[in-house]
Amino acid sequence: MKEIIGIYGTAASHWVGDGFPVRSLLYYGDLREHISPFLLLDNAGPAQFAPTDKRRGVGTHPHRGFETVTIVYAGEVAHADSAGNSGVIGAGDVQWMTAARGILHQEYHSEAFARQGGTLHMAQLWVNLPAKDKMSAPRYQAIVNADIPRITLPDEAGTLRVIAGEYQATHGAAKTYSPVNVWDLQLNADKEVYLQSPATHTTLLVVLQGNV
């Protein structure tokens, strides 16, 4: 059993652009080595949006030296960047963008989602790059839900998706520079689960919905 260093509550909400109402659940400036190599985790939504023809989101902006991992739970997000990558990710999909030596990108609600309206919920995790990899070429991984390994937990406790790293010899879909495990866990009500992680790893448990 690992020592619990701290339990942190929900931060105040703020807007990123005009499309993402965000709560920053983790921030490197406060926790530093306790969450390395992770820098930040934002939880956007769940939020309701009315149908519109207007583009909602964040215009072109730069990133450098780290990776952004966007996990969509509801709605659709469209991405485009200066390396020529573009695409739409929907519920269950993951976008893993490596900014490395530098990239410009933009994120908006997809055109179809904007016109239809509905619930948007996503999380975005920032992962620091090792010093030796910070000047690597930018990279973009669009990972659809069907390509993410899914494990059924014992006693009908729920499911675990292995986005990156591995869990019980099941390897995740994303290619990473740092040895990290990113698991997306859906735990059913009144159930419990015991998860093993490497003794040398810092472990973060982030509750996006519900209570533990």
Where are these regions (language model features)?
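Short, structured patches in soluble enzyme cores that scaffold and shape functional sites
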Residues: 124-131, 144, 162-166, 186-189, ...
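Ligand-binding loop in jelly-roll beta-barrel domains
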Residues: 99-132
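A short glycine-rich, His/Asp/Glu-containing loop-to-beta-strand
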Residues: 14-73, 151-194
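Long amphipathic alpha-helical segments that form oligomerization/scaffold cores
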Residues: 127-160
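"Short basic amphipathic alpha-helical interaction patches in structured regions
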Residues: 83-90, 109-112, 139-142
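Glycine- and acidic-residue-biased ligand/ion/polar-headgroup-sensing regions
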Residues: 64-84, 90-94, 100-104, 189-191, ...
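Short, Gly/Pro- and small/polar-rich lid/capping loops
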Residues: 1-12
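Short helix/loop capping segments that flank catalytic or ligand/cofactor-binding pockets
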Residues: 34-35, 48-50, 80-81, 106-107, ...
